[in-house]
From Swiss-Prot:
Lineage start: Eukaryota, Metazoa, Ecdysozoa, Arthropoda, Hexapoda
Protein name per UniProt: Beta-1,3-glucan-binding protein 1
InterPro entries recorded: BGBP_N, BGBP_N_sf, ConA-like_dom_sf, GH16, GH16_GRP_C, Glycosyl_Hydrlase_16
Gene Ontology molecular function: any one: carbohydrate binding
Biological process, per Gene Ontology: carbohydrate metabolic process; cell surface pattern recognition receptor signaling pathway; innate immune response; regulation of innate immune response
Amino acid composition bias (Low complexity), ranges on this chain: 133-150
Predominant location: secreted
Function, in words: Involved in the recognition of invading microorganisms. Binds specifically to beta-1,3-glucan and activates the phenoloxidase cascade. Causes aggregation of invading microorganisms.
The organism of origin for this protein: Manduca sexta (Tobacco hawkmoth)
Glycosylation sites: N368
């Protein structure tokens, strides 16, 4: 009986919805922040608004905005969110509902795109956030008369692009994390859980362990630790399967390693986090305050990586931007390196990297490391001092790379002069240990050869040499903040 009553009510409700046309809602983006939705009053007793930002509604779901308004004001029913931060190009999907004379009426499938801003009084604003002048007698330009209709922007637009809809103003801060709160997986950063492989084949596995990845004293902390510390003395000779939580490609060596006579499981646990799922950008200025780690064969990763790898997935053919790198050995700790990488092997691997040699080790204290990336050039600076600039040559990087036998370089011809650095990149922070490309064979006290089958075994067998250099107070990469600005 109850079910029958409900069905009858539902039929009556749906029929009633068809009997009266709900007035179109007026949506307004308010500067500097706010959303206002309203309809004119016509004797209604309730107005409800349900909507989502940049995501379609699934039927009659509640949505991000879900509000019932029970009283009209000055002849209109008004929903207001005073904290909404809307950008040009943002799209709101919504449905509305009204009650009149005890019956409900609904308007579905609403869509609205932000094309400009208004002030609190509803007056449209110009590019300077001032009300558009109504005193001028000159008619506005018409479409087809030299100016196409389109949105008005409250600022001078930047060449920078971001991975979320909307416009970007010149000099606008696009991203900031001061690491004042614990890492929340996926909220901003995603920890990588995998075995890194080609092209550098470092001697570590990325994991999310409290001892090697955490936030403390306002800093991101990433440090290395032997695998045997976490998993026992024979861990390097046992299969390590990360498949149930691996962020790499399942079914490959990125998620599972089996040891053999010549190959051990990577003997060091480090960490790496990225913003691939939450934030990526094209062109901008990256500023990162960090204290570099000290210890033999430690390689801090402070870099930008391509989201889609449109020019190829192997050997850095889609590019890698090193914001800063100071290797931890005593012979390297006074040498800062930054810039673009477009090949895994020499001589082109380091052809465009720039160096800044200091009188004091870069590992002693925090420094502000900056990389500015534009459609024409990539510029590196530290503490406000520019130490390197790579300008895209006429015709792009193809010619010089082709001369160095970089086979995939021909793909860059499809892009702009700065290709492969003309696509979206995300932020990556982490640490590698050793590997087959970062350290030349002539490095002091290096216990392995880059081309040796037992390179990782030889590294591990020499732990009595390098492990004492990993002091607890020095071996961590510390990051105070990460900021990205539009050009």
């Amino acid at each position: 009986m109850l079910k029958s009553v409900f069905v009858l009510f539902l039929v009556n409700y749906l029929n009633s919805v068809r009997c009266l046309e709900v007035p179109d809602a007026k949506l307004e983006a308010i500067y500097p922040k706010g959303l206002r939705v309203s309809i004119p009053d016509d004797g209604y007793t309730l107005f409800a608004f349900h909507g989502k930002l940049n995501e379609e509604m699934e039927g009659l779901e509640a949505g991000h905005w879900s509000r019932d308004i029970t009283k009209a004001k000055n002849g209109r029913w008004i929903f207001r969110d005073r904290n909404a931060k809307l950008k040009i190009g943002d799209k709101i999907y919504f449905w509305t509902y009204i009650l009149k004379d005890g019956l409900g009426y609904r308007q579905d499938n609403g869509e609205w795109t932000v094309t400009g801003y208004v002030n609190e009084d509803g007056e449209p604003l110009d590019a300077n956030f001032e009300p558009r002048s109504t005193a001028s007698t000159a008619a506005p330009p018409q479409a087809g008369a030299g100016q196409a209709p389109g949105p008005s922007y409250p600022c001078e637009l930047s060449v920078s692009e971001v991975s979320v809809p909307g416009f970007v103003c010149k000099g606008q801060m696009l991203f900031e994390d001061n690491f004042n709160k614990p890492l929340a997986d996926g909220r901003i950063w995603t920890p990588e859980i995998m075995f890194p492989g080609e092209p550098d084949y470092p001697f570590n596995v990325y994991m999310k362990e409290t001892d090697n990845l955490h936030v403390g004293n306002g800093n991101l902390v990433i440090k290395p630790m032997p695998l045997v510390t976490a998993f026992g003395e024979d861990a390097i000779w046992k299969t390590l399967d990360l498949s149930d939580r691996c962020t790499g490609l399942l079914g490959t060596a990125q998620c599972k390693r089996d040891p053999s006579d010549a190959i051990i499981v990577p003997p060091i646990v480090t960490a790496k986090i990225n913003t691939k799922k939450t934030f990526a950008f094209k062109y901008g200025r990256v500023e990162i305050s960090a204290k570099m780690p000290r210890g033999d064969w430690l390689v801090p990763l402070i870099q930008l990586e391509p989201v889609n790898k449109n020019y190829g997935i192997r050997n850095y053919v889609s590019g890698l931007l090193r914001v800063a790198c100071v290797k931890g050995n005593t012979e390297y700790i006074k040498t800062l390196v930054g810039g673009p990488i477009m090949s895994e092997a020499e001589p082109y691997r380091t052809a465009n990297l720039k160096e800044f040699i200091s009188n004091e080790p870069w590992t002693n204290e925090f420094h502000n490391y900056t990389l500015e990336w534009s459609p024409d050039a990539i510029t590196m600076a530290v503490d406000g001092i520019v130490y390197g600039r790579v300008t895209a040559p006429a015709g792009g990087f193809y010619k010089e790379a082709n001369e160095q036998n970089v086979e995939a370089a021909a793909r860059w011809i499809q892009g702009s002069n700065i290709a492969p650095f003309d696509d979206m990149f995300y932020i990556s922070l982490g640490m590698d240990v050793g590997g087959v490309h970062e350290f030349p064979d002539e490095a002091i006290n290096k216990p392995w050869k880059n081309t040796a089958t037992k390179a990782m075994v030889n590294f591990w067998n020499a732990r009595s040499q390098w492990n004492p250099t990993w002091l607890e107070s020095e071996k961590a990469l510390l990051v105070d903040y990460v900021r990205v600005y539009a050009l």
